[in-house]
Amino acid sequence: SRFECERISKALQIPADRITAIYNGYSTHFTPLPEVNMHIVQQYIPEKGFLFFLGNTDPKKNTERVLKAYSLYLQRSATKRPLLIADLKEEYIDRVLQQEGIADIKRHLYYPGYIPNSHLATLYNASFAFLYPSLRESFGIPLLEAMACGTPVVTGNTSAMPEVAGSGALTVDPSKPEEIADRLLQLEQNPTLYQEQKAYGLQRAQQFSWARTAGELSKVYQSIKI
């Protein structure tokens, strides 16, 4: 990302014009599915239409604020969609819930632990929205995966995330749980906005591919004078 190029330039004192940003792509199986395989979905959560979050214990993933935001969402939502959390253990989630004083939301959470990559496209398609409000990302391939599936995305307005997402995602200040909750409620309460974000995400994802990555990398190699 250009964000990382700037960081490298400053940290290593390399002229910016000597660094080229070449964007990642995503696997082509991330695409809108004509029909969601409920057998896969129900391995993790009973019904589709849930909120989806790929978490881990790295502080930059912002798990504490995501759960706080979800608590705020539940207080104001008529639908109260469940939250599916990938790649986090129950002990960690319990600790965060106790720390934030929101243990009462646990009944709305599903946390199956590891979810294989082969199931992610189905889960993106089955979800109502994807949460990716990290504090920092060098790129953010899950953004592309979700957008490519036609899933509305809520992401952070910091580091490389707005650069990657463009208009294909709703951005928030990731340090403010109330903003994350507001965006979820906007998607839920405004059908026009929801459909627009699905379309914008699909359009944005089409600008990225591994073939394009390879082509741009090849151009850089060919431009090097030995």
Residue ranges and their predicted role:
Residues 1-226:
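Carbohydrate transferase catalytic cores enriched for Leloir-type hexosyltransferases
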